[in-house]
From Swiss-Prot:
This is N-acetyl-gamma-glutamyl-phosphate reductase. PANTHER family: N-ACETYL-GAMMA-GLUTAMYL-PHOSPHATE REDUCTASE, CHLOROPLASTIC-RELATED, N-ACETYL-GAMMA-GLUTAMYL-PHOSPHATE REDUCTASE, CHLOROPLASTIC-RELATED-RELATED. Catalyzes the NADPH-dependent reduction of N-acetyl-5-glutamyl phosphate to yield N-acetyl-L-glutamate 5-semialdehyde. Its main location: cytoplasm. The active site is at C147. Pathway: Amino-acid biosynthesis; L-arginine biosynthesis; N(2)-acetyl-L-ornithine from L-glutamate: step 3/4. It catalyses: N-acetyl-L-glutamate 5-semialdehyde + phosphate + NADP(+) = N-acetyl-L-glutamyl 5-phosphate + NADPH + H(+). It comes from Methanosphaera stadtmanae (strain ATCC 43021 / DSM 3091 / JCM 11832 / MCB-3). NCBIfam families: argC. It holds the Pfam family Semialdhyde_dh. Keywords: Amino-acid biosynthesis, Arginine biosynthesis, Cytoplasm, NADP, Oxidoreductase. Belongs to the NAGSA dehydrogenase family. Type 1 subfamily. Its EC number is 1.2.1.38. One of its GO terms (molecular function) is NAD binding.
Length: 342
């Protein structure tokens, strides 16, 4: 069985470590390069203690010396955009996990990320397989979705595309690993333990990403409000999706059936059959998105709940899912592990 060579750029963070963890059990992959500028020469286990006994060290090669079929860029936004064109020039296909290439209109990126885009003409395919599978197959550059947008979009698509709602309010709660590996006051134990903290209210960078993708469906004018919260768990995002139905002859059971039918062929989206409420613990460590808790009150307010692991379906697992599609592998290859409940 032939293998492809994979390079992971910026592997010192949590998403980089997850890429290594998941790719080591992928039968079609050879990890050829794992980079970290600050940790050059060190064993991966110096930062990722779960990656013991791997014959891999952090390196810091020149971009031109990175020889790979596919490059995963786990660099921060603003940094990734500078190097992605060089990887493409080397002949690699690139999956970028930053926000640098997620927007069709570069002015939206510049407004929300507060920096000028250095390669505005370089366009990527938005890497959410559930909506862009055919485009992903032939893409040379994939913009891997953000963690919050993944759960938010998947919880919204059926009702938006079927024009059942025109406004959505998203309340998302994320584990602290979503804030990255570098410690700060928000993720300091005395600050985040026994606490829930809303943040970036009305101005989170993932808001326009959610809006752009949902407006490609339905009427194209759906309004989206998004508020994230930091909660004292390590992994996972649970999103509660609130909307008001435009039709009063639709029941919660009808909506549940709609979701079941919409996602029936999706390997990693599981609409809970008994409409149970998704749990973070059920998806931890997995590439699955669970959807359930679909409820309708007496004023036609609809609630839909989704749960993902922010580091897997929300980042590294989804990136590998995209790689599988790009190279014609089974889409689920290397990603079949179930959640780590309890």
């Amino acid at each position: 069985m032939s293998k492809i060579d994979v390079a992971i750029i910026g592997a010192s963070g949590y998403t980089g470590g997850e890429l290594v963890r998941l790719l080591t059990r992928h039968p079609r992959v050879n990890i050829s390069t794992v980079t970290s500028r600050k940790n050059n020469g060190e064993d991966l286990s110096s930062l990722h203690p779960n990656l013991q006994d791997l014959d891999l060290k952090f390196t810091n090669p020149d971009t031109k010396d990175i020889d790979a079929d596919v490059v995963f860029s786990a660099l921060p936004h603003g940094v990734s955009m500078k190097l992605v064109p060089e990887y493409l020039d080397n002949g690699a296909r690139v999956i970028d996990l930053s926000g640098d290439f997620r927007f069709s209109d570069v002015s939206v990126y510049e407004k929300w990320y507060g920096m000028k885009h250095e390669h505005p003409d370089l366009k990527a395919v938005f890497g959410l397989p559930e909506i862009n599978r055919d485009k992903i197959k032939d893409a040379t550059l994939i913009a891997n979705p953000g963690c919050f947008p993944t759960g938010a979009i998947l919880s919204s698509l059926p009702i938006v595309e079927n024009k059942l709602v025109d406004r959505i309010i998203l309340d998302s709660k994320s584990g602290v690993s979503g804030a990255g590996i570098s410690p700060n006051n928000n993720t300091h134990y005395p600050t985040c333990a026994d606490n829930i903290k809303p943040y970036a209210i009305a101005n989170h960078r993932h808001t326009p990403e959610i809006r752009e993708q949902l407006r490609n469906f339905g009427t194209g004018t759906v309004k989206v409000s998004f508020t994230p919260h930091l909660v004292p768990v390590i992994r996972g995002i649970i999103t509660t999706n609130h909307s008001f139905l435009l039709k009063n002859d639709v029941s919660a059971s009808d909506v549940h059936d709609l979701y079941m039918d919409y996602y029936k062929n999706e390997p990693f989206v599981k609409v809970l059959k008994d409409n149970n409420i998704p749990l973070l613990a059920s998806v931890r460590g997995s590439n699955y998105c669970q959807i359930g808790g679909i409820s309708l009150d007496d004023e036609d307010e609809l609630v839909v709940v989704s749960a993902i692991d922010n580091l897997v379906k929300g980042a590294s697992g989804q990136a590998i899912q995209n790689m599988n599609i790009m190279f014609g592998f089974d889409e689920t290859e290397g990603l079949k592990e179930l959640g780590l409940y309890p």
